[in-house]
Structures are given as structure tokens and as C-alpha cells.
């Protein structure tokens, strides 16, 4: 009898203990510092920062190392001979402009998609940011996963390049509609607020950017799919939200608490200089914009000149590059996403193709 009574007592004690342990099970097993109900506005900031890379390593690996092939900048570090300027970059470096956007966009994108049930202004905004970011991937690599990318899918079909650009144009057009309508209907409400480092939450500015990006995409595909390009360009210039057409409209990305990555690479690391190609062109034409773009050389006897560094020299020493001109950025300089000058140029190019994009060619140029 005592045996049974003892067993019953022990069993009851265990039940009481189990009950006390599970009373606060959710509390004990919940990270109080984690965001549980996805707030689309909070998730948006890091997505926006991918359209022009703020993070210093992302900027260097993509915009600076690969970007020097455009002839504007020149990397002044040989990285032991493994670099883009001598066409000897590693496979890992080749993959960075692909991997980084996918890694940094889709985590937050899927959370916003789920939180909004793929509807509304937040979702339209997220689709626009994805479109702007992935445009660069499509330009670099061609066919890629886009329209079929879904949460939880480890194997995704590639879209053709035509499908990618068409989907990007569709996302931009929808964003221009949704964001501008929201802006008008709410009397200028800015739901992103401080989470927007470009327009401080002003959806009117973002709608203009979406339309201006449609012009950019249209021009890039005009030689291959002229029909799609013309339709997109003409729709963009007639959209009620308008375009980025004055410097006050310019889309400029604030670096916030981070240093401007170009200034950091040039001044703190000594890894970036101005490219000789762009300096030679601008010197030849007496271009008055040079002081806005470059700092003058510190080379002996040339401190009154802009002197660019030549790409492709495999034998130079980093110390030899110290005196060449550097980009005229400060630590707090904003990064340009899109400016009115590009809109004017794209319109002029459209007029040359016979598109109905407003403005006369000479005026646009």
C-alpha cells in the first residue's frame, strides 16, 4: 500500500512540475528581440540599400571592381594579380554580382509578400525594389530566375532574358500606378518614413523613379526587342506620376551612419582612383563638370590637373597610385540612383528612334 501511495505521490508531483514548466512555455521559448509580425516598412530599408550598394564590401566587389570596366573608375590594388582590370578575376568574384542581390533581396521580400498577401502599396514597393536590383543582374548575366521565384523553392526555372525584362517592366509599371494613387488618395502620406533613405517615404518620388527606370530598361532592350521597348517608353513618359526631370527630383541614396563606400575605398583603403579614360575625354572637351566629379592630382608637378589612372597594368605598385585623382566624394556624400540628366538623355535617344517620348532631340540633349 505504501508503495502505491508513494508512486501516486511522485506522479502527482511530476504532473505539477510539468504544469509549472509549460505555463510559460511560449514566453521562455520566444526571442523577445526578434520581429515576429513582419512590419513591411521596417523590412524595406535594407532592400532599398541594395539598389546602389551602400555596404562597403558589396560596393567594392560589384560597383567598383566590375564597374572599372566602364572606364569611370580604376582600382588601385592588384590583389596579387587577381582582378577585373587584367581579366583575371576569380570565379568567386565573377559570382558576386549574382549572389549578393539574391541573398539580400529575397529574405525580406518573402516576408513582405506573406505579410501583405501579395497586395497593396507595400507589396508593389517591394516588387519595384526587386525589379531595380535585378535589372543589373539581368544586364550582367542574361537569363535568370525571376517570375517563378517563390519562398521555399530550392529549384527554380530560369526565365528567358525577354521574360525577365518584360516582368521587370511590368513590376515597375504597377508600382508607378499603385504608389502614385496611394500618394494622391492619402494626401501625401509617407508610410515608410525614416525607413526610406532616398525620398523619406514620399511615394510620389518613387513613382517618378519607377517611370524613369522604365525608360532605362526600354533603351537597354531597344536593339533586341524594339516593340516592347517603344511601348514601355511611351507609357512611362505619359504616366500621370511623371518622371525625374529636375535635380530636385533626383533619387539620391543616403548612406546614413555608414561612410560613402567610394570615399572609403579611395581615401581610407587607397584602393580606388579615377580612370584615365573618363579624364582624357573630359579634358579634351573642356568639360566644366570635372570639379564636381574628381579631386585634383597630388602628383609632383601636376597638382593643378586631373590625372586619371590607366587600367590593365599588371605590374604597378599600390604606392605608385597614391597621387592620382580620386572621386570627389566625402564620407557623407549620397549615392546617385537616378538623375534628371539621364531622363533627358533617354528621351533624346528615344526621339532618335522615332518614339513619341516628348521633348525635341536638341532640347533633350
Please name every model-derived segment.
Residues 1-19:
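Sec-dependent bacterial lipoprotein signal peptides
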Residues 6-10, 28, 134, 218:
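General helical structural elements
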Residues 8, 12, 51, 297:
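Residues that line or immediately flank small-molecule/substrate-binding pockets and catalytic motifs
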Residues 13-17, 21, 281, 336:
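Generic secretory/membrane-interface signal
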Residues 21-74, 80, 92, 111, ...:
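Membrane-proximal, proline-rich intrinsically disordered regions
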Residues 37-41, 74-365:
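Structured, solvent-exposed acidic/aromatic patches
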